[in-house]
């Protein structure tokens, strides 16, 4: 939406941009600009290595260049209960703010997960607020013009303007951020970021309360001749967002006139690689679903830093591709090789339709070294006589512990050699010890006992050593399907994620004999519970997870009771009829299990099964005070999910009306529907709304809705009164 003070009349009419206007600039390069090794030789490439247009520019180049400092997954509050690392995330966040000040950027863009928890501790909120006030509130001039309708971009707020347009605040460094899966919505749809937004310290955008339809309105910014359209979608469940793209229920608004003059930047917080092997959506967002008009994507949630923007070619005969920048986290929240890579913030310069990217190494990140040690040979003469004995050296020390400690000392030496002056002194060490060959039948060493010997040398002594036995199936014994799944889904550190474990749980219960399958509790509920319990950090409490699981279980019991009440009540005239009634209830429960089993086993119903996860009878609410990796639903979504599931078929069959997003109709509370999704062909549709924005859809139309006859009355018997099952 355009602000009332701005006009698009002077813009070039919307047309296909000539290829020559987006060719890569071949002028002289700055030494500090890192070239993109994956940049294609495309005629309409937007990434350049230098934004200078010549030796004698007509005016100061800074008047047209938008400078943005990008960082994602800061996780303030991570490890606050651990002695050595409790301030790591906050200290690095301060470094990000310092870099922004030194580089004199126009704005900071955060890609989600500023906080590690939805409800961070008071100490963490206090420290973050201090830093934001210290670095963001000052008298520095801001050259960015805010052109869009702030009441639409920040519709969750009562303040209808960007924070640096507030006359009561003196903002010198604006921050724009979306929410991630750690600081996501819960309860009444609020997060800790909402407090920072309402206090004027950050600008929170990309919140979407309507999970049936996503309408993404960009933040429009201008500096000199450069126009930036900033799009954002806060963290959503990947299955839900993929369905939105495939069902054509997500729209990105664009300026009607001069749309090709805007640099389109999209920030999101989703799984990028496939995280589940046995699901149709894979628990990730495929890059192929993203519209092609974007120039650059900032991809949050993935902690591995990829310093070079990666080009994604267009899948269409006509159309440009886009670049994806994956900044990675600024703090390590897991002990994996990907987290041990160099952490960076990124300086993005935008001029016209071109951009340049430069990684800035972070100097305060705690050093980390990850490695593996394979134990497969026992030295001659050291083999124990009894299986319960462990091989010892002549000096009485255990041979495996000698090898483990030698490897740890080598890793610590490496960490100290690479340590920079501003980095914390104690490093993070993760050694994966694999017992194989001669060591398979030997009792492994005690990992924690070894770690405690390094308590004052490393930051993570307790979980420094990870021990794994490379067990193989016995001869003549076939590996079960679930064992194969666990082996395939285990990551490089030998651990299985909660999301993949959900798939294993589903497969196990679905493949059980029908009589042994569960009636009330659903596998999805168990998987969600395990996900929350696994997210509890060491020393944390499981109170919230216990409460959520109890609530889920009681709700599922209530669903079964209500379903049984809807079934016909037979006549009861004598005591023998009570036995028949009891048998009928048993049969009803069996029929319910059978219907569920057939539906979940049917491969073509895979999408329906994913949609069922939004249903309260399957739903496990997210834990609001601990880390949740992939679930991002809220309690409000639980309350409304029955209505959403019931309306998922009729919403496409209703006679559509115009959307009515005009400025005069805002806040009127009128329902709005669109004509999206009514074509059976994969097309790119365009519409113009009353504010001069262009609605685009580059996603395929939804498949026809399936219908189920489950729950209808048996035979042709006349309807009877509902059962009274208050005793159930």
UniProtKB/Swiss-Prot annotation:
Q: Where is the composition biased (Polar residues)?
A: 622-632
Q: Which residues are responsible for catalysis?
A: 182
What keywords were assigned to this record? Chromosome, DNA damage, DNA repair, Endonuclease, Exonuclease, Hydrolase, Manganese, Meiosis, Metal-binding, Nuclease, Nucleus
Q: Where does Mn(2+) 2 bind?
A: 113, 181, 269, 301
Cell compartment(s), UniProt: Nucleus; Chromosome
Report residues binding Mn(2+) 1: 73, 75, 113, 303
Q: How does it assemble?
A: Component of the MRN complex composed of two heterodimers rad-50 and mre-11 associated with a single nbs-1.
Protein name (record): Double-strand break repair protein mre-11
The taxonomy runs:
Eukaryota, Metazoa, Ecdysozoa, Nematoda, Chromadorea
